[in-house]
Amino acid sequence: SSPVRKVCRGLIEDGLSTILVTRDIVTRIQAQMLGVPAEDFAADQVPSGAGHYTGRADVYVPDALLSLFKREGISAESLYTVDREGRQQPASLTENQFAILRSDREEKRTLLGRFRGGRVYPLCHNGCRPFGVRPRSLGQQFMQEALLLSAEEAPLVILMGPAGTAKTFYSLAAGLEQVMEPESRAYRKILVCRPNAQFDQDIGFLPGSEQEKISPLLRPIVDNLEILLDLEHKKERSGEEELRSRINYLFDTGILTAEAMNFMRGRSITDTWLIIDEAQNLTPRQVKGIVTRVGRGTKVILLGDPAQIDHPLLDERSNGRSYARERMRG
């Protein structure tokens, strides 16, 4: 990249308007130190901060309409938001966006719903307990709803949040519920992929089979499985050996499988619960490659924390998970 910076500097000295466009953050900093304007690819950038899509909205509704909510939902025309100056604005909702409905008389009186077809309807899976797990926060209630919707209704779910918000834990719980339970079975298996910054580049240099190569990356998945299986058998005091045996059973029977990201290309994945953990370390191109591999009856769950990006060429606005969030809204 040094010759590139020198060329840019030479063009500037010749009086030509020059901007260096690169994804490499270090190169941009070095260029600016030399007096060369540098920026990232604008086309791949998504809004940051308050401008990005969160998947939920806080809206107000006339108190008299709340009694009709469970029976027929509430029209979006009756909803409004309040700006910082206290002025009312018509609510602008996106299809499938979750809504927190607040009474205009008593703000603490709230109801939860999902916007579809011009109206906000109650959540369908509010009372469910996938694999015995109960939502403990507002975000987890919305998470549960999105995960338990059918693949036809919600083929792609994007979960974002800091560490400790149960993204991986809840995704596994909902997946196991819909793969292992006969009454609610909707998928053949769970497929887990978990990239990291160097995963696609250096997996071939690790010894062993594909499973042995990716096993270090799946330790967080196994940690969550241990908690879930312990919850399922909470009346029994499971020893370490028995717990390990149950986890091995899931892998040995094909209920749960794990694959490397660079082996996804060219596949058509059907009737599968597909979890992509740490998706903030994927590029937009990689996310597009995953989504286009999905066949009939498959549900894709992208998980990620935008504050924990390890890829040297990605940031909060250019990573694949953020890109998918903005492009696939609705």
At which residue positions do the language-model features occur?
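Acidic, metal-associated active-site segment
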Residues: 1-17
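Conserved helicase motor core of SF1/SF2 NTP-dependent helicases
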Residues: 14, 25-35, 39-71, 124-148, ...
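Short beta-strand scaffold positions
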Residues: 21-22
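Walker B catalytic carboxylates
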Residues: 277
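Interdomain "pre-motor" coupling segment immediately N-terminal to P-loop NTPase/helicase cores
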Residues: 40, 45-126
